[in-house]
Amino acid sequence: MELVITGSNNKVSVSDAVFGREFSEDLVHQVVVAYRNAGRAGTKAQKTRSEVAGTTKKSKKQKGGGARHGALTAPIFVGGGVTFAAKPRSFEQKVNRKMYRAAICAIFSELNRQGRLMIVDAFDLEATKTKGLIEKLKGLEVGKRPLIVTEEASEHLYLSARNLPYVQVRDVQGLDPVALVGADTVVITADAVKKVEEWLA
């Protein structure tokens, strides 16, 4: 298939397997959830009744009409331990390479179908100026949350976008499913398209 390069009459030939794939919501959801879970610290920790600080001496006598209690570290008391205490753990989920790449292809294909994929000849700035980047994005009409994808990282582009909270800049190597799904429009250079095809082929 061929896609039009924005701002010119030129077209770029792309693979149907990457940009014309059928969308699978289940697959994309699974990969996005796995990617987000892999970023979790997993450091949550609580103390059980055996770990909380406090005496284990019986708090009151056995007889006398009240409820029977032992140590004040029991979960029933304020300041006591937690019954099913959370412990540090990994939230990582295994995702096969084939599944991951298929999900990326499905996302690119859906972006293309929805008209949210914009291909440009080049996307670079002569100087590190946030104002210059804003003007360039306004000219392209990319929406509030654009994702700019280049073949290789550009320092001018990265530093110019750093002060814009909803603008993301990635090179092909740094692409991930969460960034692609969350973008209103993906602006990608023609060279980056070729590199994406090499990666996902």
From Swiss-Prot:
Q: Which GO terms describe its molecular function?
A: rRNA binding; structural constituent of ribosome
Q: Does the record bear Thylakoid in its keywords? A: no
**What superkingdom does the record give?**
Bacteria
Keyword field contains rRNA-binding? yes
The record's InterPro entries line, in alphabetical order, gives: Ribosomal_uL4 (IPR002136), Ribosomal_uL4-like (IPR013005), Ribosomal_uL4_dom_sf (IPR023574)
Q: Name one GO biological process term.
A: translation
UniProt xrefs under SUPFAM superfamilies: Ribosomal protein L4
Q: Where is this region: Disordered?
A: 44-68
Q: Which UniProt keywords apply?
A: Ribonucleoprotein, Ribosomal protein, RNA-binding, rRNA-binding
Kindly state one GO CC term assigned in the UniProt record.
ribonucleoprotein complex
In terms of HAMAP family, this protein maps to: Ribosomal_uL4_B
Family the UniProt entry places it in:
Belongs to the universal ribosomal protein uL4 family.
**Complex formation:** Part of the 50S ribosomal subunit.
What is the documented function of this protein? One of the primary rRNA binding proteins, this protein initially binds near the 5'-end of the 23S rRNA. It is important during the early stages of 50S assembly. It makes multiple contacts with different domains of the 23S rRNA in the assembled 50S subunit and ribosome.
Put simply, this protein is called Large ribosomal subunit protein uL4
